[in-house]
Swiss-Prot record:
Co-factor binding details: Binds 1 [4Fe-4S] cluster. The cluster is coordinated with 3 cysteines and an exchangeable S-adenosyl-L-methionine. Binds 1 [2Fe-2S] cluster. The cluster is coordinated with 3 cysteines and 1 arginine.
Assembly mode: Homodimer.
Hydrolase in keyword set: no
The keyword 4Fe-4S appears for this protein: yes
Protein's job: Catalyzes the conversion of dethiobiotin (DTB) to biotin by the insertion of a sulfur atom into dethiobiotin via a radical-based mechanism.
EC class of the enzyme, as a word: transferase
InterPro entries: Aldolase_TIM, BATS_dom, Biotin_synth/BioAB, Biotin_synthase, Elp3/MiaA/NifB-like_rSAM, rSAM
Name of the protein in its database record: Biotin synthase
Gene that this sequence comes from: bioB
EC number: 2.8.1.6
Pathway terms, separated by semicolons: Cofactor biosynthesis; biotin biosynthesis; biotin from 7,8-diaminononanoate: step 2/2
Residues bound to [4Fe-4S] cluster: C55, C59, C62
Length: 341
């Protein structure tokens, strides 16, 4: 199957891919994957919540929203030294990228210097850096870029026409605007969504269509399977057919051939066999470690054992060529900002 990079995918084309027999879809996705990546290599990231709970948003899936009774206690922003210690542990465990997440609607300018210090110190360990802090303006994005940040994560979560069923405190366009600010300053983007929230296949097509028709495909595409947390509105939602999740991975791989497709939240509930199908469908990145923000993740030892059983190995740092360097028309903006770092 052709792996030409396209930005003009249509909903009809994506529906046709989803409708293929699963063996045929896996074959096509694997063919595209092998044109750009070594199928035996998996990029390994670790995610740390550097500021937990107390978020003012109402995302129906999120245990960190302060309006839901989920048992998550709001905590202050971690000290830089504590974050660096966690990053050292992640590197020793085999991670090549360290992601720092904060439960904010958007960071305040006064928070940026401390986040920037975290980025600089983690970067000095030889790790790639990623942050997910909520909505950013262009000046904040530039400050993070100047500190050495490699990736910024900001998910669109779902399709535009299902979004209002899940979130009311932030508009879909707000998410697209943050992605534009991140691209404008030259940061690599990490952007995906969540499935299993009660959406239909049409909505899953809409999510991938949004990502695959952005001005530049995200460098990383995290595909999250809803982790149902008691106290959140989506607790009790009917679980997604595992084969539908595999189809989601495969269509993401076909439509965004050079992106890292990441198994993210929900992997704790996946069998080894399901994870193998996802790797065969083109997933080539995982979050590694015992916890993703506030929800469980497979233990490091389990992942290491699975890699050994499947003959997989961690991808070395910087083996993935940045999509930002490959995409046409990605012009970095000239920005005049007050000095916040």
């Amino acid at each position: 199957m052709s792996s030409i990079i396209r930005y003009d995918w249509t909903a009809e084309e994506l529906h046709a891919l989803f409708d293929l027999s699963l063996p045929e879809l896996l074959y096509r996705a694997a063919s595209v994957h092998r044109q750009h990546f070594d199928p035996a290599e998996i990029q390994v990231s670790t995610l740390l919540s550097v500021k937990t709970g107390g978020c003012p948003e109402d995302c129906s899936y999120c245990p960190q929203a302060q309006r839901y009774d989920t048992g998550v206690t709001a905590q202050k922003l971690m000290d830089v030294d504590a974050v660096v210690a966690k990053a050292r542990q992640a590197k020793l465990a085999g991670a090549s990228r360290f992601c720092m997440g904060a439960a904010w609607r958007s960071p305040k300018d006064r928070d940026i210097p401390k986040i920037a210090a975290m980025i600089r110190e983690v970067k000095a360990l030889g790790l790639e850096t990623c942050a997910t802090l909520g909505m950013l303006n262009t000046c904040q994005a530039q400050a993070l870029k100047d500190a050495g940040l490699d990736y910024y994560n900001h998910n669109v979560d779902t399709s535009p026409d299902f979004y209002d069923s899940v979130i009311h405190t932030r508009q879909y366009q707000d998410r697209l605007d943050t992605l534009a600010h991140v691209r404008d300053v030259g940061l690599k983007t990490c952007c995906g969504g969540i499935v299993g929230m009660g959406e239909t296949r049409q909505h899953r097509v809409g999510l991938l269509l949004t990502l695959a028709t952005l001005p530049a495909h995200p460098d990383s595409v995290p595909v999250n399977l809803l982790v149902q947390v008691a106290g959140t509105p989506l607790h009790g939602t009917q679980t997604l057919d595992p084969f539908e999740f595999v189809r989601m991975i495969a269509v993401a791989r076909i439509t965004m051939p050079r992106s890292m497709v990441r198994l993210s939240a929900g992997r704790e509930s996946m069998s080894d066999e399901l994870q193998l199908l996802c790797f065969m469908a083109g997933a080539n990145s995982i979050f590694y470690g015992e916890k993703l923000l506030t929800t469980a993740n497979p233990e490091t030892e389990r992942d290491q054992a699975l890699f050994q059983r499947l003959g997989l190995r961690p991808m070395h740092l910087m083996e993935n060529v940045s999509n930002q360097d490959q995409h046409h028309g990605n012009v970095h903006a000239d920005i005049a900002c007050k000095h916040v770092v």
